[in-house]
UniProtKB/Swiss-Prot annotation:
Pfam families: DUF188 (PF02639). Coiled coil: none annotated. It comes from Brucella anthropi (strain ATCC 49188 / DSM 6882 / CCUG 24695 / JCM 21032 / LMG 3331 / NBRC 15819 / NCTC 12168 / Alc 37). InterPro entries: UPF0178. This is UPF0178 protein Oant_1002. It comes from the Bacteria. Belongs to the UPF0178 family.
Length: 161
């Protein structure tokens, strides 16, 4: 029986993703398909041949649900959403935040607990503000993490499209 290797693909939680241009460049270099998932229209550069737009309903978490349902080993999920990161990891996907943080099965529990605690503290008025502004250092860390994830998947037998 000849089993074809799985193709690496990138699934992007695209509504507020600050690194879409970087994803397009890396995907082009590695010949990888990209799926931008959003609940509204997202412009795609004309030369981004491997990028597909997936528009879901405007129902709460519809984009997250689509990404989680389509996550699998060989997929790289780009999201800042911690619950979505957890769901994608459960399906075997690699998960990277736009700031370059790599989520793993061994770290996601603490990350999810911290997120829930901070949400509770914000709701109670104990903590104000949000995350630090996105920086060039974050962009660089993201590019490094994405390249490393692709290399690891290729070494594990996944292929470029």
């Amino acid at each position: 029986m000849n089993i074809e290797p799985e193709t690496i693909r990138i699934l992007v939680d695209a509504d507020a993703c600050p690194v879409k241009a970087e994803i397009y460049r890396v995907a082009e270099r590695h010949n990888l398909p990209v799926m931008l998932v959003a609940n509204s229209f997202i412009a795609i550069p004309r030369d981004a041949e491997r990028v597909e737009r997936v528009i879901v309903s405007d129902k709460l978490d519809a984009a997250d649900d689509w990404i989680a349902e389509n996550s699998r080993p060989g997929a790289i999920v780009i999201t800042a959403d911690i619950p979505l990161a957890s769901r994608s990891l459960e399906k075997g996907a690699s998960v990277i935040a736009p700031n370059g943080r790599v989520h793993t099965q061994s770290t996601i529990g603490n990350t999810l607990a911290t997120r829930n605690l901070m949400d509770s503290l914000r709701s109670a008025g104990e903590v104000t503000g949000g995350p630090a502004p996105f920086s060039p250092k974050d962009r660089s860390a993201f590019l490094s993490a994405l390249d490393l994830a692709i290399v690891r998947l290729k070494r594990a037998g996944f292929v470029s499209g």
